[in-house]
Amino acid sequence: MENIIEVRNLKYKYDSESENYTLNDVSFQVKKGEWLSIVGHNGSGKSTTVRLIDGLLEAESGDIIISGDKLTAENVWEKRRQIGMVFQNPDNQFVGATVEDDVAFGLENQGLDYDLMVERVQQALELVGMQDFKEREPARLSGGQKQRVAVAGVVALRPDIIILDEATSMLDPEGRLDLIQTVKKIKDSNQLTVISITHDLDEIALSDRVLVMKEGQVESTATPRELFSREDLEELGLDQPFVNQVKVALRQSGLSLPDSYLTEKELQDQLWALLSKM
């Protein structure tokens, strides 16, 4: 599968006088159509990385290649049309008086034909299940509903890449799971690429690959299963998955279990298999 993003030897620091780099020689690739989660402690460089990809920041050195083209000052606005970004706090993204006005805002800036714009807004709201709230004021929505509208605003623009910058971190567990399942459905049905900065284990479990960042560098890449089998998850700013906690407790009780489980269902199946042999 071809790469839609290539990051090569990226360096960046917020203070030009400082000797300390926020990002120091960061390189990785994102394949077209994949879901890449980026994890690491606060300050590891995750958000800085995606802001550089989106052209919100300019690297001191290194290259960012998007769909075969090097990101430059001359083409940054063109490349931004390929990328939609959803941030942590949806209130900071709302500009419209109603939900449908807000989703239409980016399309208006692109000078889209009115009838096509109405069609795109309706389709986007239907995809995130918010069509019945189109005339509602954004301020009157729940946190999860606000993030759904933020996703709709991105989807309406028809990007190739969606970046979630801790977009689920302010939601309750049910709202987080609901939102990431919505994004996955949209990704799969439209063959989109998703980059997700997250500490949420359910979100990580849905991804194809995980990029682990530490102190401004890429520490490793792994599948979710490989990541969850690590014993130093807390050092990466992640909780131990529930299935890992259960596995440790069962091993301490004398049960022999495989090293990794990605879901509770896998653990249940293994336990049933063990019980059937007793």
Swiss-Prot record:
UniProt keyword Transferase, yes or no: no
Chain ranges of the ABC transporter domain: 5-240
Membrane-protein topology: Peripheral membrane protein
Keyword Cell membrane listed: yes
InterPro entries: AAA+_ATPase, ABC_transporter-like_ATP-bd, ABC_transporter-like_CS, ABC_transpr_CbiO/EcfA_su, ECF_ABC_transporter_ATP-bd, EcfA_1, P-loop_NTPase
Assigned keywords, A-Z: ATP-binding, Cell membrane, Membrane, Nucleotide-binding, Translocase, Transport
Protein name per the record: Energy-coupling factor transporter ATP-binding protein EcfA1
Similarity section: Belongs to the ABC transporter superfamily. Energy-coupling factor EcfA family.
GO MF assignments: ATP binding; ATP hydrolysis activity; ATPase-coupled transmembrane transporter activity
Cell location: Cell membrane
GO cellular component, one term: ATP-binding cassette (ABC) transporter complex
NCBIfam families: ECF_ATPase_1, PRK13635.1, PRK13648.1
Enzyme class, UniProt record, top EC level: translocase
EC number(s) on file: 7.-.-.-
Function (record text): ATP-binding (A) component of a common energy-coupling factor (ECF) ABC-transporter complex. Unlike classic ABC transporters this ECF transporter provides the energy necessary to transport a number of different substrates.
Annotated residues for binding of ATP: 40-47
SUBUNIT field: Forms a stable energy-coupling factor (ECF) transporter complex composed of 2 membrane-embedded substrate-binding proteins (S component), 2 ATP-binding proteins (A component) and 2 transmembrane proteins (T component).
Organism in which the protein naturally occurs: Streptococcus sanguinis (strain SK36)
